[in-house]
Amino acid sequence: METLQHLDNLRLSGKIRHIGLSNETAWGTSRWLTTARTHNLPQMVSIQNEYSLLCRLFDLDMAELSHHENIGLLSYSPLAAGLLSGKYADGTTPTGTRRSINADLGGRINEHLWPALNGYLDIAERH
């Protein structure tokens, strides 16, 4: 509640217009909304979570919550840390890329990735 009170003070002073969350779950978001409503504080209007063809966690429960609570998605990593750009096709790792620093790109690379990724890249190339 203290965080929401501080955010409300920032809103009332004109320093921010709205508030949102990042990397939050549906349960966590619903708790923020309940606290805001209970104490007449500003409600979250956006959620910034990862979302791409390879990361669809938002679709499991956040999409429903976002729809019913009018919370917009500000997706990040829409190209899945560069995987969907094709620069890592066939397992290559160009010098100076994220993958040259973090080999599995934060857990995105696993044995199931390459068949799906190659399928997406094939479709993209044909269209």
Question: Where are the language model's segments positioned?
Answer:
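Beta/alpha (TIM)-barrel catalytic core signal, keyed to glycine-rich beta->alpha loops juxtaposed to Asp/Glu
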Residues: 1-127
